[in-house]
Amino acid sequence: MKPIEKLFVGNSLDSVAVLQKALDFGIDFLGDEWKNVNRSEVTVTRILGGQSNHMFHVTSSTSATSFVLRIHREGQSQFDTDIVNFAIFSERGLGPKLYGFFEEGRMEEFLPSVTLKLNDVLNTEISRKIGAAFPKYHAINVPVSKSRRCFQIMRESLHDYQALGGGDFAIFPTVVTYSEHPKSISIKDLLTEIDLLEKWSIDLFENTLVFCHNDLTSSNILQLNSTGELVFIDWENASYNWRGYDLAMHLSEAAVIRNTCPPGIVINEELTDNPPNLQAFCEAYVDSENKIKGLLSSNISSQVNSLIQECKFFWPITHLFWACFIMKLGLFECNREIKLNAQAREHLAVYFHLRSRSEMIYKKLSEN
């Protein structure tokens, strides 16, 4: 644990050390309005919900501008990527203002808002707003590698899984009732699946590469108190990927309920097989994208239907991604008591259940 993280995590938030450091940040990045603030006038509170970083809201009893301190847990490479992404979105008004960055984190604008919950993203009107917001982000050109990352991360995860001693993986889900999966699968067979799905994706959708969030769960969406506008946050996992993968990741995550009982997740089969907002979500996306590009389409319904098929094609791939990633995490010593392997089995069961649909879409679109 590095010094800044250790300071804020290892001490009481009303300790002299924490309050003084927060005051120093205010003076360093916001200048005069914080220079006359006394340490006794500063309050630091933790913002809950950050999975890959610690977040703290810093205020004072004066009129000085409040701010958020975001202290990263990741390595330097991912931290640098997140800073670049955040700065670009901030400049375009698609996120909080960036006040400054420092080793291990950044200081940003505090946006009075609420974080969406799972039930919120299942609401049709909110789902439409999310669909309409996506193209604003997908339209941005970000100066990072344009190579698609999802399948490469799967391969890297399986390589690490094998290096940690992992072998053939038994599939016996305890929550979902899908039965199309094999009883077990080898690393070799998983890599074959990855290669095949990557080929299908390239054949069909190579012209849809955009900058993707890759993890837009409800907890990564803010709704501003002032306007009701939605803001996507936490871009540390962002990279270029296929558009449909990004959309399917968001939609598929809306069917995943996280809890404290083993295996830690419940994947809702009805929401997986018959997502209620898919049509409305895709309609809003197409309408927003056309407006951004200045297009007047004569066949909106065709565009919407194509996007729906695109999302359905990538849907099982998101579950394959999480299965491979979680298989690796499950072998880390610190995770052994969490039983992450059980979650990987659930995701693999969903993958094999939906895989045939992706194959049908591939064959149909390949004929056209």
Swiss-Prot record:
Classification via Pfam families: Choline_kinase
An annotated GO BP: CDP-choline pathway
Domain of life: Eukaryota
The EC number(s) this enzyme carries: 2.7.1.32
Cofactors: Mg(2+)
InterPro entries recorded: Kinase-like_dom_sf (IPR011009)
Key word Nucleotide-binding present: yes
Reactions this protein catalyses: choline + ATP = phosphocholine + ADP + H(+)
Full protein name: Putative choline kinase B3
Organism: Caenorhabditis elegans
Keywords from the UniProt entry: ATP-binding, Kinase, Lipid biosynthesis, Lipid metabolism, Magnesium, Nucleotide-binding, Phospholipid biosynthesis, Phospholipid metabolism, Transferase
Similarity comment: Belongs to the choline/ethanolamine kinase family.
GO CC entries: cytoplasm
EC top class named in words: transferase
